[in-house]
């Protein structure tokens, strides 16, 4: 037999599972033609199954799934549908495969003899071009084969306030996150869950955006990272993407409880303590929720009351901000209080930071409280951003937004002169907040965000018409037209909006940055994060407020990204909402004494008066 004939015979032997030229027994490789990722063909090998299938023009080998493990071809099919949406192929294109059958057989043969290489991975052969690509795979939370009935999605281990959690380095984190590892585990342009990551070279800081796919919803959530280096910005961008996806919908497999508050009052959180909507907006075209009464049924999930130390039911659409459909939602909710961390305790601490930050801003905004200004000092990073703003004629003010909850909170306010606003170079007002136990980190978080928003405005207007403040002019006369985040920021970007926020540029006094930071640590080296969390919880409890924690952790994300996810809810704190008719301030007693909750706070007008003007929070 000549060499060509021998090669042909070897190929046939590999397909048929007979002995090849090297004397080894070749497993029979099933053909992918006629199989799909939803209904793959499999080969038992190495204590598991190797999947093969067609996905449009792609001939796919993998993943290899050990027995009793997760991550299969069906997961890959679900992710591809999520990533590509309506463009994802439903049917294979078998006519192209014969051209590449031998190549595919070689790939499959190699996989069969080293299946562990395709654990949570797959190889795709594009039958249009012959290109071979390798892809990482994360088990899909909606895969009924891997997680039947949601079994296996929950992450074991509840909130533990006794076990020490040592801080890594001098940052307030319990583990360091590696950019390369997150890229390898999360980023894949075909199979997600992070489908795309990109940088903005024109930003004053190294701005990175990560588009993370929401499982089962073909919607991408944006995660953002800002720092002095693009490589450093990728880590927070990846993690914020995970935070928004796990916080939007329930991927934990945990059961829900159906009923009204009246039915479940002994075990449930009273929605009135969360702040209700104003009845005047019930039935308004911009109000897309059900009017609340204790008899309105909805779905609930279990959380943990840190004050009462017991399980407590929380409305699912409060715990997960995208949850629920019309007819089941009576409260508008945002991602406020969602956070991720290397441990559950770390996630809770950062979720609490966010609730405190938003609550403080809304207290000051709706009460029109004048605040103390913080002198900028000589910090080189802060000076750099201040110089960039000065070059554009923009003015930066730092305000002390620290409330009675006692965590350092800074408000950065950037204002533009009339000429710059009229010419479209900048919005009249940009602002952002930051909260952290390290006052410098609080200040820098606020300044970095608002400086980026103000300086990038001309570019973003060119990219998205919705950013242009001019389109918001009618909103000054009719607040019900304010529906989205960009409406909120856009309306206050108009020069004519100044009367609504003049109190923010009229500070009561000036304190040195050292005064803002007095008694606060700048390094957490050697600290115990659990102890710090206990201190903050005790401080909140001392005010008669609870901190309710909903564990949003989902096993596929915890395994891939190494983080736990939570939603922190503080009944009595003001919730962040978007849309004028969605404001939730009714039944929140703290708002009536808001000006007294800030050191040096003075109401612009009358103490206790509430000004229901849409906020400018980004």
Give, region by region, the residue ranges found by the protein language model.
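Helix-biased "structured C-terminal domain" signature
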Residues: 32-38, 42, 55, 116-618
């Amino acid at each position: 037999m000549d060499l060509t004939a021998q090669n042909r015979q070897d190929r046939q032997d590999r397909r048929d599972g007979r002995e090849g030229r090297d004397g080894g027994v070749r497993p029979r490789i099933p053909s992918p033609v006629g199989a799909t990722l939803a209904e793959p063909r499999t080969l038992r090998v190495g204590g598991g199954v190797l999947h093969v299938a067609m996905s449009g023009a792609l001939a796919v080998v993998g993943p290899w799934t050990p027995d009793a493990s997760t991550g299969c071809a069906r997961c890959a099919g679900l992710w591809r549908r999520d990533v590509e949406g309506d463009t994802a192929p439903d049917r294979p294109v078998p006519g192209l495969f014969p051209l590449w059958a031998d190549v595919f057989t070689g790939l499959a043969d190699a996989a069969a003899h080293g299946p562990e290489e395709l654990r949570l991975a797959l190889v795709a052969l594009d039958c249009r071009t012959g290109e071979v690509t390798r892809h990482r795979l994360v088990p899909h939370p909606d895969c009924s084969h891997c997680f039947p009935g949601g079994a296996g999605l929950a992450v074991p281990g509840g909130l533990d306030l006794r076990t020490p959690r040592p801080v890594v380095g001098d940052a307030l984190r319990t583990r360091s996150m590696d950019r390369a590892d997150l890229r390898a585990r999360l980023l894949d342009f075909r199979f997600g869950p992070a489908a795309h990551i990109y940088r903005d070279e024109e930003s004053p800081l190294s701005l990175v955006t990560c588009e993370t796919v929401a499982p089962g919803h073909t919607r991408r959530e944006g995660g953002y990272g800002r720092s002095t280096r693009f490589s450093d910005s990728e880590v927070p961008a990846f993690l914020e993407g995970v935070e928004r996806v796990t916080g939007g919908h329930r991927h934990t497999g945990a059961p829900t409880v159906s009923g009204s508050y009246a039915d479940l009052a002994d075990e449930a959180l009273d929605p009135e303590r969360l702040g209700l909507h104003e009845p005047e907006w019930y039935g308004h075209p911009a109000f897309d929720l059900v009017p609340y009464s204790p008899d309105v049924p909805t779905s609930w999930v279990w959380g943990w009351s840190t004050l009462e130390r017991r399980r407590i039911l929380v409305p699912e659409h409060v715990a997960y901000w995208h949850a629920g459909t019309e007819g089941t939602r009576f409260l508008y909710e945002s991602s406020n209080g969602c956070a991720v961390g290397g441990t559950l305790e770390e996630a809770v601490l950062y979720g609490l930071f966010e609730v405190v930050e938003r609550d403080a801003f809304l207290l000051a905004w709706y009460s029109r409280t004048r605040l103390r200004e913080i002198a900028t000092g000589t910090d080189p990073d802060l000076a750099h951003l201040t110089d960039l703003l000065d070059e554009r004629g923009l003015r930066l003010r730092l305000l002390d937004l620290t409330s009675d909850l006692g965590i350092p909170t800074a408000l950065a306010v950037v204002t533009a002169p009339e000429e710059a606003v009229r010419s479209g170079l900048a919005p009249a007002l940009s602002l952002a907040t930051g909260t952290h136990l390290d006052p410098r980190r609080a200040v820098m978080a606020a300044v970095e965000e608002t400086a980026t928003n103000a300086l990038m405005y001309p570019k973003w207007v060119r990219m998205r018409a919705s950013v242009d403040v001019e389109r918001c002019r009618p909103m000054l006369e009719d607040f019900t037209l304010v529906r989205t985040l960009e409406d909120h920021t856009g309306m206050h970007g108009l020069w004519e909006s100044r009367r609504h926020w003049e109190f923010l540029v009229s500070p009561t006094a000036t304190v040195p940055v050292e005064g803002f930071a007095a008694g606060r640590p700048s390094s957490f080296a050697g600290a115990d994060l659990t102890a710090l969390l206990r201190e903050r919880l005790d401080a909140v409890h001392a005010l008669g407020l609870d901190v309710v924690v909903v564990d949003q952790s989902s096993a596929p994300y915890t395994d891939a990204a190494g983080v736990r996810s939570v939603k922190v809810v503080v009944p009595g704190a003001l919730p962040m909402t978007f849309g004028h008719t969605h404001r939730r301030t009714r039944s929140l007693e703290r708002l009536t004494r808001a000006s007294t909750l800030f050191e040096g706070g003075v109401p612009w007008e009358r103490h206790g008066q509430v000004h229901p003007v849409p906020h400018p929070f980004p």
